[in-house]
């Protein structure tokens, strides 16, 4: 049973968010949470909260055991960009883009050992 959670319009550029997200893809939930707690990047606490939310959804809505969950898919999409202005010399302005991200995680149960595949 797949469980999905998503956070939208996070004020982190997608490129920087993907650096953190790539570290936890495919890991068991317990390991992914442990890794995110020690990463210094701005995206780490956001992803940590998202994983905890997905685990709570799995436990509450589908009666799944959080100890048997793993990160099946996690990806970052680009959100809207906001234009902001940066003052320059001689009364001119430069354009700055404030980038945002949408982060989606899909958790699934670990397959049982010895269970037939297919």
UniProtKB/Swiss-Prot annotation:
Superkingdom of the source species:
Bacteria
State its role.
Answer: This protein binds specifically to 23S rRNA; its binding is stimulated by other ribosomal proteins, e.g. L4, L17, and L20. It is important during the early stages of 50S assembly. It makes multiple contacts with different domains of the 23S rRNA in the assembled 50S subunit and ribosome.
Gene Ontology biological process terms, A to Z: translation
The keyword Acetylation is annotated on this UniProt entry: no
Query: Sorted alphabetically, which HAMAP family does this protein's record hold?
Result: Ribosomal_uL22_B
GO CC annotation terms, alphabetical: cytosolic large ribosomal subunit
Keyword annotations for this protein, in alphabetical order, are:
Ribonucleoprotein, Ribosomal protein, RNA-binding, rRNA-binding
- Assembly with partners or alone: Part of the 50S ribosomal subunit.
State the PROSITE patterns in the record: RIBOSOMAL_L22
Q: Please name the Gene3D superfamilies in this protein's record.
A: Ribosomal protein L22/L17
Task: Tell me the protein family, please.
Answer: Belongs to the universal ribosomal protein uL22 family.
A single MF term (Gene Ontology): structural constituent of ribosome
Q: Which Pfam families match?
A: Ribosomal_L22
Name the UniProt record assigns to this protein? Large ribosomal subunit protein uL22
């Amino acid at each position: 049973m797949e469980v999905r959670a998503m956070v939208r319009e996070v004020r982190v550029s997608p490129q920087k968010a993907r650096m953190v997200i790539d570290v936890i893809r495919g890991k068991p939930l317990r390991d992914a949470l442990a890794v995110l707690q020690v990463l210094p990047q701005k995206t780490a606490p956001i992803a940590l909260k998202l994983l905890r939310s997905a685990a709570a959804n799995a436990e509450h809505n589908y009666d799944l055991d959080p100890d048997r969950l793993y990160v099946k898919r996690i990806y970052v999409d680009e959100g809207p960009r906001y234009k902001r202005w940066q003052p320059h010399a001689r009364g001119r302005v430069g354009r700055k883009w404030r980038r945002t991200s949408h982060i989606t995680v899909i958790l699934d149960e670990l397959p049982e050992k010895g269970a037939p595949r297919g």
